Curated annotation (Swiss-Prot):
One of its GO terms (molecular function) is protein-lysine N-methyltransferase activity. It comes from Paraburkholderia phymatum (strain DSM 17167 / CIP 108236 / LMG 21445 / STM815). The lineage of its organism: Bacteria, Pseudomonadati, Pseudomonadota, Betaproteobacteria, Burkholderiales. It is an enzyme of class 2 (transferase). This is Ribosomal protein L11 methyltransferase. It holds the Pfam family PrmA. It comes from the Bacteria. GO terms for biological process: methylation.
Length: 300
C-alpha cells in the first residue's frame, strides 16, 4: 500500500486549525493552498517580517495532508473534524502518491541558471554549461538565494556591472551567501556577509568553501566597524526602511549601495528614507520587483 494525499477544500477560518489537527493525529505533512489558484478568483497573499498580513489564508482554501499507508483518510479527517467541533465532516478526495526517487526528482527540477552577461548558478549535480563563464556552484537549500528569485537576480546583475577589483563589499542579509560569493568572484576584497539567522550563516560558509571564496560571515553583532565601497542588501522593504541609517552609514562617501526585496509599488517609499544620505533611484525592475541603487553623498 502506498502513501496517500488527503485533499480537503473548506473555508478560510477552518484551514489552519484543520492543518494543525491533522498533524497532531499523525499526518506526515500538511500544506494549505489557494483552491482557486490559476483561476480569475485566485488571491495572492503578501506579508513581510514585522507586519501582519491582511489575510492569513485564502477565502477558499485547499488543505493537503500526506498520510502514511497505515492511516485511513476518512477516519483521520473525521477525528480532526470532531476535534475542531465541526458539525459535519468536510467533503474530501484521496490521491495516491507514487513511489519515486525523490532525490533524483528534486534534482531534475533545478537546472543551471544564466544571469547577466556571464554568470551561471550551477547545482552540484550539473556541469557548467560554459566553462569560461563566472560559475557559482550552489544547491537549493534552507537559506534564501539560488538566483531564481527576481530580487536575487537583480542584485547579481548589479554586482556584475558594479564591482571593481579590491573593493570592499558588505552583503547584509546574506542568506545563502550568493551575493557575497559573486562579489568575491568579481574581484572584491575583503567581502563580509551578515545575517540574523545562524543557519543561514552556516549555509553561506559552506557555500563559500565549495566555491573557494574567502568571505567572513557572522551575525549582526559581528558586523565589522568601518565603511565599505559597496553595500548590498536583499531583504524586504520594511526592514530596509528600519535599517536605513545603519546601512547608509556602512557606505563610504562616494561608495555605492544596492537594495532589493522591494516591490515596484514600494520603491519610492523606501528610496525616500535613504535620500537623507544616498542619491538613490530605481536601477532596474523585473517581474514586479525592483533594485534600488545609489551613491552616498560626500557631505554625509
Amino acid at each position: 500500500m502506498s502513501y496517500r494525499e488527503l485533499v480537503v477544500e473548506l473555508a478560510r477560518e477552518h484551514a489552519e486549525a484543520l492543518s494543525d489537527a491533522l498533524l497532531e493525529l499523525g499526518a506526515l505533512s500538511v500544506s494549505v493552498e489557494d483552491a482557486d489558484a490559476d483561476t480569475p478568483d485566485e488571491q495572492p497573499l503578501f506579508g513581510e517580517p514585522g507586519l501582519t498580513p491582511e489575510r492569513t489564508a485564502w477565502t477558499h482554501s485547499r488543505v493537503i495532508a500526506l498520510l502514511a499507508p497505515e492511516h485511513e483518510p476518512a477516519v483521520l479527517l473525521a477525528a480532526a473534524a470532531n476535534e475542531l467541533g465541526l458539525a459535519d465532516t468536510p467533503s474530501f478526495s484521496v490521491r495516491a502518491v507514487e513511489e519515486q526517487d525523490w532525490v533524483r526528482l528534486t534534482q531534475s527540477q533545478f537546472d543551471p541558471i544564466p544571469i547577466g552577461e556571464r554568470i551561471w548558478v550551477v547545482p552540484s549535480w550539473h556541469d557548467a554549461p560554459d566553462p569560461d563563464a563566472l560559475v557559482l556552484e550552489l544547491d537549493p537549500g534552507l537559506a534564501f538565494g539560488t538566483g531564481s528569485h527576481p530580487t536575487t537576480r537583480l542584485c547579481m546583475e548589479w554586482l556584475e556591472q558594479s564591482v571593481q577589483k579590491d573593493q570592499s563589499v558588505l552583503d547584509y542579509g546574506c542568506g545563502s551567501g550568493i551575493l557575497a560569493i559573486l562579489a568575491k568572484k568579481c574581484g572584491a576584497n575583503p567581502v563580509f556577509g551578515i545575517d540574523i539567522d545562524p543557519q543561514a550563516v552556516e549555509s553561506a560558509r559552506h557555500n563559500s568553501e565549495r566555491n573557494r571564496a574567502e568571505i567572513t560571515y557572522g551575525l549582526p553583532a559581528d558586523c565589522p566597524a568601518g565603511e565599505f565601497d559597496i553595500v548590498v542588501a536583499n531583504i524586504l522593504s520594511n526592514p530596509l526602511k528600519l535599517m536605513a541609517s545603519m546601512l547608509s552609514s556602512k557606505v563610504k562617501p562616494g561608495g555605492r549601495i544596492a537594495l532589493s526585496g522591494i516591490l515596484a509599488r514600494q520603491a519610492e517609499e523606501v528610496a525616500s528614507v535613504y535620500r537623507q544620505w544616498i542619491d538613490i533611484a530605481v536601477w532596474r525592475e523585473h517581474e514586479g520587483w525592483v533594485c534600488l541603487a545609489g551613491t552616498r553623498r560626500e557631505s554625509n
